[in-house]
């Protein structure tokens, strides 16, 4: 304890992102179109290895762990992994970056395991545009996931990739999500 990591600009590093899978249940055109080669499951870090890495990171001053993917919720045991990481001394916060499709379905387990916050990738509120961007008709599931997280008291941030001539006219609608709910919206180019 007591050791810290400093980046090249003299800033203390307090968080770490861990990608637990490259698999995803969507095929977003800017991220993972069809035909992408996937890593063999045997080449992924085991949850025990991830937990060990988080223990070492905590000893080096890491306080926040961000679980990402691919889509982390497609990996069996993701919710339990969050609980294991939350038990590590020094880890104060665990967040999840997700496309939100499986979020409502797994919300109670995520809450039981101590998830602090969720970042949800959502580029449009138009069902047609959503299917165009992601290759799947799953917008309804994402909106249910957002609502489930808000109702559970989990901090919610929406990450939206702006794409000219596809969803650039929807900025206002996406911002509207945050108008009456405790949701932050962040636009990404």
What are these regions (language model features)?
Residues 47-66, 74-178, 184-186:
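Radical SAM/AdoMet-radical enzyme domain recognition
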């Amino acid at each position: 304890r007591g050791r810290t990591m400093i980046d090249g600009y003299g800033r203390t590093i307090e968080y770490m992102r861990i990608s637990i899978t490259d698999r995803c249940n969507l095929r977003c055109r800017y991220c993972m179109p069809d035909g992408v080669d996937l890593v063999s499951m045997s080449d992924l870090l085991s949850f025990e290895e991830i937990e060990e890495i988080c223990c070492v990171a905590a000893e080096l001053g890491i306080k926040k762990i961000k679980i990402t993917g691919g889509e982390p919720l497609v990996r069996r045991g993701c919710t339990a992994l969050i609980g294991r990481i939350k038990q590590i001394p020094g880890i104060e916060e665990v967040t999840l970056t997700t496309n939100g499709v499986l979020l409502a379905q797994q919300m109670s387990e995520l809450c039981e395991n101590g998830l602090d916050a969720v970042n949800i990738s959502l580029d449009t509120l138009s069902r047609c545009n959503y299917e165009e961007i992601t290759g799947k008709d799953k917008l309804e599931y994402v909106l249910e996931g957002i609502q489930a997280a808000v109702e559970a008291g989990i901090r919610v941030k929406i990450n939206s990739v702006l794409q000219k001539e596809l969803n650039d006219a929807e900025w206002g609608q996406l911002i509207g999500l945050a108008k009456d709910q405790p949701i932050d919206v962040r636009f990404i180019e």
